[in-house]
A protein has these predicted regions:
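A residue-level marker of the well-folded mature domains of exported/periplasmic proteins
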Residues: 2-216
C-alpha cells in the first residue's frame, strides 16, 4: 500500500517559517551584524553546535535601552541558530542573557560568572564591568576548555578567544577631534566617562585625552 508522509509538527512548521524569512525582515538586524565583519561571525552559516548545547551571555546591566537591545540580540541569535541547524523541542540550543541587578556591579557580575561556569556552557560571552576582575574565573574557564568571548568591553586576559567591540581608541580620538573643532581649538574641556573600571571607558578616556593634549 501507499505510505503516508508524516504531517509536519507545529514546531517543524515554525522552524521552516523562520528559514523562509523574507529579505526585508532579515535586513532589520543583518545590516548591524555586517558592520562587525570580519572580526566576528555575522550570521549562522557554518556554525556547528550539538543538540542541547548551552551558551551563556553576561552583560553589565538589565532594563536600560542599550542592554535591552543586547538581550534582544541574544534571543534572536538563539532563534537563528536553531532555525539554521533544524533543532526543535528539547534539541534546541539554549542561549541565556544574565546581568547584575544593579548596573555595573563588579561583585554581582563575578558571582554570575561563577554560577554560569558551574553549568559548563559550551561558550561564555561577557561584557566586563571591571578590567581587573574575572581573572580567576577565566583561568577556570580555560582549564575547563570553555571558550570566553568578550563584547562591548573586553579584557587583557590572554586566554580570551575573541573580542567583539567598538574600536575604542578610534572612538575616543574622533570624539576629541570633533570637540576641539567645535571649540575652535581653545578653552577648557570636561570629559564625562561612564565608569572608571571598564576597558572601553579607560581606552576612550586615554585616547581622547591624548588627542587633546597632543594636537589641540
Amino acid at each position: 500500500g501507499c505510505q503516508q508522509t508524516p504531517k509536519a509538527t507545529d514546531e517543524e512548521k515554525k522552524i521552516e517559517a523562520e528559514k523562509n524569512t523574507t529579505k526585508t525582515e532579515e535586513k532589520e538586524y543583518q545590516g548591524k551584524l555586517d558592520l562587525i565583519s570580519p572580526a566576528a561571525y555575522n550570521n549562522t552559516n557554518g556554525l556547528k553546535l550539538k543538540k542541547g548545547d548551552y551558551i551563556s551571555i553576561i552583560g553589565k546591566a538589565n532594563g536600560t535601552q542599550y542592554w535591552d537591545e543586547v538581550k534582544k540580540g541574544v534571543t534572536q541569535a538563539a532563534e537563528d541558530l536553531n532555525a539554521s541547524l533544524g533543532y526543535t523541542g528539547k534539541d534546541k540550543i539554549k542561549v541565556t542573557y544574565n546581568a547584575p541587578d544593579k548596573a555595573d556591579n563588579v561583585d554581582d557580575q563575578v558571582n554570575l560568572l561563577d554560577e554560569e561556569l558551574d553549568r559548563y556552557p559550551v561558550a561564555v560571552g561577557i561584557s566586563i564591568v571591571d578590567l581587573q576582575a574575572c581573572q580567576v574565573q577565566f583561568d577556570l574557564a580555560t582549564d575547563s576548555e570553555i571558550p570566553v568571548v568578550t563584547f562591548d568591553s573586553g579584557s587583557d586576559y590572554q586566554g580570551v578567544a575573541a573580542d567583539v567591540s567598538t574600536d575604542n581608541v578610534a572612538a575616543g580620538t574622533e570624539a576629541a577631534q570633533r570637540l576641539a573643532e567645535e571649540m575652535g581649538d581653545s578653552g577648557e574641556a570636561v570629559l564625562f566617562i561612564q565608569d572608571s573600571k571598564s576597558q572601553a571607558a579607560l581606552q576612550r578616556e586615554k585616547a581622547a585625552t591624548d588627542e587633546l593634549t597632543a594636537n589641540h
